[in-house]
Each structure stands twice: as structure tokens, then as C-alpha cells.
Amino acid sequence: MLTDNLSAQEENKETLAQHAAMDFTTGIGWNADNQLYRPASDHEGSLDSFLKPAAFETQRLFENDRFPNVIVAMDGTVLAAWNGVAIRRSSDGGKTWDTAQVIAEGFMSGGFVVDEVSGDIFAFIEAGHPPAPLYIYRSADHGITWNKQDTIVFPNSFGHVPTMHMNEHGISLRHGRFKGRLISACRWYGRSNYPVENFHTHYTNALFSDDGGRTWKASEPFPVMGTGEACIVELSDGRLYYNTRRHWAPLAEDALWRWSGYSEDGGMTWTNPRRSSVLPDGDVATTYGLMGGLVRLPVLGRDILLYSNIVSQSGRRNGHVWASFDGGETWPLRRQVYAGNFAYSSLNAGRPGTPSEGWIYLLYEGGEETGGSFSRFNLTWLLQGEKTGNGSLPGWITP
């Protein structure tokens, strides 16, 4: 079910606090900037749930087309988003799936965001291949129905209003001063998407909201040009870790590997950019790069990050998942997911106390046939992968 405007229930909400109280009766707080939040302990649990007997499953969810995002609603419903713009829902942790539902006709923008205060989900949809008008749809029932809301996006200091096209899903912040903020990676196309000579005018950044998704602000640029299609996770100390594709660089080799950086102000600015020496950015025989997935497992007090991309010098194939146990400083482990066709991908993880608990989710372009394939696995399975030589496993995780 779709409507052109917000539902009557949404229009009559007097405050975000009122909305939150309708869905959650305890645990709501206010941060230093008077933003609503729920404590991290409501969303993060123990490591044990991810360390059950090794499990790995794959199934095909979509025929043809492309552009993945996978998110997990507050009740544990897994939503696989695809192309222009369809979703499939799973209420049993990713085992079985409802038939596909079209949110709206348009172009998949990536950047789906779950508001962990209200439980609402935001979908960003563009009228065509960006740059193009951006529309925001909101679901207040874990992705069953969707309503179009006003799109209010404020530019950054350069006057740029970015596009959301094919970034990884966004997140709700749980730690530090800005807990309660919604944030998602986005991008600025500069002069234009093509020709290639314009790539150096591109950059990535972020959109964030401090009022429950009613309005959004564009952050300052990630300080590396030629970037596009990025991911953001929050570390347990409140810093944000940023990881991005780069399809142009003055030195060609700098576009073969992922670039990362950090934010200490909730995603308004980005610092300490550096090139990875272990995380590839697509086929390393080219400088074009490849969208990858990124997630921090919801484990209290641990910064376990997972990243998805390919290990290839001959096209988009041979998908892998990498693991970091120190917030992205080192990536000592990887495991192959699929040896054949593998392109854009999105990662997420299950929520404690729901049917999704303990599962890691990967939606990617490729598989045995064209379209979208979905894998679910646990950390035990991933720990049986190969060592990269980049750091070592900590004692608390060594199998």
C-alpha cells in the first residue's frame, strides 16, 4: 500500500517523542542536544549469539536488475531492497520471504535507514539515474506499507545537495553525544556523472537527521576526490568509521583499494583519510571500483566490522567477506562467499531478541543466475576462513 502523503497518523504526531512513546514504553532518553535516543543495550547483545554452530545458506531473491540494500527492522524483519524500487520481507530471520512489493517507481538510491527510536524505516528513491529529484518514503510498520513524505534536505557549506545513489544502508547512532541521529552515506556528482574526465569532481559525504527523519542535512565532503558509493558504521566509542569506493585518483594505484576515515562529530566532518592495503575496491586490474557492504555486529563493547567485495583481477566475480575486530584498523580474516559472478553488495546483522539474532546478511548482485542472491551466515562460519596477514585475531574471538 502506497499513498502520496504521510499517513493521517504521521500528520497528527505532535512530536517525535510522542511517536516514540507509542512504540516503546521504556528506555527513551535525551542526548546533550535534546535528541531522542534509546540506550545501546537495547540494540546490542552478547557475542555468543553469533558463535553458534557454523551456518551458511544462499538463495536467489530477485530475477534480473541490480542495486542491493539489506536492512533489519526493529522487530527483526529482514528487508531486501532491489532496483526500482522493490522489497521482499522475511519475518523468520531470512529463511522464507514474502513476494516482492514495489515501494515506488523510480531509481534505487541505496541508503535505507531504520530509526531505532521510532522504529520507522526510510527509503530514498530518485526519479531517474542521478542527479535527479530525490523522494523519501517512510514505513511505520516494519516495511509493510510506505508513505511519501516531504523531502527537505539542507546543503553543506559548498551549497551542494547530494544524491543517495547506491550507498550502503544508513544507521541510527547509539553512542556518544549524537546518539539518536540518523545518518547515511551519500555522494556529490560534481560536474556530471560522465564523461570519465569529470570523475575527479566527485566526492562522497553523508546525510544526517536530528529530528527523526523530517529534515536532513548534508555533511562536509569526505576529503578525498573521485570517491563515490560509501558506507558508515558507528564504533563503540561514538566515532564513525567511513569506508568508500574510489574510481579516480591522481595515482592510479590509489583507486585500486578502499579508502577510509573517521568522524568525531557525528558525521558532520571527516578526517584521517587513508588508503587500505588489504581491502580491494573491485577488480584490482582496473581503477573503476565496486560498491561494497559494511556492518558492525551489534555486540556490546566490541567493534567487529564486516566488509564485502571481491578478490579478482578478471571482472566482477569471487565475492568475499572480510572481518575486523578492532574497528577497522586491521582486517585479519576473510572468507569466500561465491566464486562466480559477484558485483554490488550490502551487509547487515540481526537484532538481539528477534528471529534475526545471530545472523549476518549479505545481499549481492550475482550468483548462479542474474539478479539478486541472498546469503545468511554466522560469525562461526566466517572464522573458518583464511588469514590475510593484516593483524591477528584477538584472544577473545580465536576459535
Placement of each model-derived feature along the sequence:
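C-terminal segment of classical bacterial N-terminal signal peptides
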Residues: 1-5
